[in-house]
A protein has these predicted regions:
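C-terminal motif of bacterial Sec signal peptides marking the signal peptidase cleavage site
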Residues: 17-20
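Ligand-binding face of N-terminal immunoglobulin V-set domains in extracellular IgSF glycoproteins
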Residues: 123
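Short glycine/proline/serine/threonine-rich loop/turn segments at secondary-structure transition edges
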Residues: 130-142
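Acidic/polar, low-complexity intrinsically disordered N-terminal segments immediately downstream
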Residues: 22-99, 174-176
Length: 176
């Protein structure tokens, strides 16, 4: 009798569970596509580590290298597109110590997000000549960037709208 009742409850639970399942799990995104800087990294354990800054150091690069290109991943949230779209990057002047033409080369504030891509890259050429080479008295140069909304993109998550880039010419302590 007890076993019969237990079987009945088990069967009833299974029916309720199957009844509640919905096979339509595709929830099409309805809003405007959003753009953001990739603001996390995934460690070897699969955990996401969130950060609002990127360290770029010439410390281990041979001294003959006078400039290098920083590659910032940019990602968007939303539906894919089969056409190129534009996004806007501006410099946050009150948080920036870097000088255009001295610490980095000028870049276009309007950038192209390539068609059929989920992530793209913002390229910034960093110049080595004016960077401090002394760790003890070394200065970290800051360049703070901010994404702005365009006709093609709204802004993404708060943590990915602004990105602080710190660059120097000495062996810096790792951020991990």
């Amino acid at each position: 009798m007890k076993m019969n009742r237990l079987s009945y409850y088990f069967l009833l639970s299974c029916v309720a569970l199957l009844w509640s399942c919905d096979q339509d799990i595709d929830y099409p995104y309805q809003g405007k596509d959003r753009i953001q800087f990739q603001h996390y990294t995934v460690d070897w354990n699969g955990n996401r580590n969130y950060s609002d800054s990127t360290l770029f150091s010439f410390g281990l690069i041979p001294s003959e290298v006078r400039e290098d290109t920083l590659k910032l991943p940019v990602e968007y949230l939303g539906n894919g597109s089969d056409r190129d779209r534009t996004y806007k990057v501006s410099i946050v002047a009150d948080s920036t110590t870097a000088v255009e033409g001295v610490h980095y080369l000028a870049f276009n504030s309007l950038q192209t997000f390539r068609a059929n891509e989920l992530t793209d890259t913002l390229y910034i050429v960093v110049l080595r000549e004016a960077l401090s080479k002394d760790y003890a008295e070394g200065e970290n140069i800051r360049l703070e960037l901010k994404l702005e909304a365009t006709d093609d993109f709204a802004l993404g998550l708060d943590g990915g709208i602004q990105r602080k880039i710190v660059f120097n010419d000495f062996m810096a302590e790792p951020t991990w």
